[in-house]
Amino acid sequence: MQSRHVPPPQSDAGEDVSGRIEVARAPMPPEPAAPLPINPVLVWIIRLGAYLPNLALFGVMIAVWQFTSSVWLPRIDPQMAVLMPAPTTIVVTAAAMIMSGELLYHLVASLKREATAFVFASAAIPIGMAMGWWRPVYNQMNPIVELLRPIPPLAWIPLSILWFGLGDGQNEFIIFLGMFFPILINTIMGVRNIEPNLVRAARSLGASERRVLTRIVLKGALPQIVTGIRIALGFGWMALVAAELVGANSGLGFLINDARSMLRTDIITVGMLTIGIVGLAIDAGIRALTRRTLLWSLAMAK
């Protein structure tokens, strides 16, 4: 007679007579799949796709320009076709000027004047901090600022020629005027927008006035100051070209004016495009700096 295995009796709690407890084991979770390798070419294509509408519009504009200059205008008015060079002609002229070093020479001269004027215009930062922080200083200086600020920099050209003569000094003075007031006004506004609780907290902890100005006020106003610098560099770049049209023997403005006297519209266009490209590059750099300083200011506020 065969014996039969009989399971031990269990209580309601799941415990058998021998005292053993049976526990159900949960299934092991599956191992996570390895991440797929990122294809850099695919990432580049996706990023490029975001700019396709802009590139398409730019291509259409170039095509219309090329057709107008090389096909339509020569049939309508050959003289006008000479005054409106085709994009292919401009590319050839730009390549020749780059190879000869002429374009680089004038570009460096303009950038040097811009940088020199910016060094002097940066004095607007401490002046603006003083005007924004101390009310008596603001009350004394603001009428003078508001009297001079509406005067366009180009209106100073006759006086600047009499004061400095024709040359770098006159050009840098005009650029300085274009840069100074945007930096000054934005610095004043940045100082006035400082959170008062931060200042009170620093003073309650025993911070000196100099420490409050350098650690709280300056850092808090920095995004607004950088915005003023961005605006100032744009204004200064425009004032630079206008000043070089009148009193300079080098620079992009001089290049354009000299080409005008020779009816070289291709050189004029190359100079104009160079001004636009450099201005775009300067603005892009300042915008990147603005984002960094804004994140820094927000982190400090927290």
What are these model-predicted stretches?
Residues 67-75, 129, 140-143, 186, ...:
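Membrane-spanning helices that line or support transport/gating and their immediate boundary helices
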Residues 173, 177, 209-243, 266-270, ...:
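Transmembrane alpha-helices
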Residues 36-69:
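N-terminal signal-anchor/first transmembrane alpha helix
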Residues 37-47, 71-120:
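Periplasmic/extracellular loop-to-transmembrane helix junction in inner-membrane transport proteins
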Residues 116-145:
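Transmembrane-helix boundary motif in ABC transporter permease subunits
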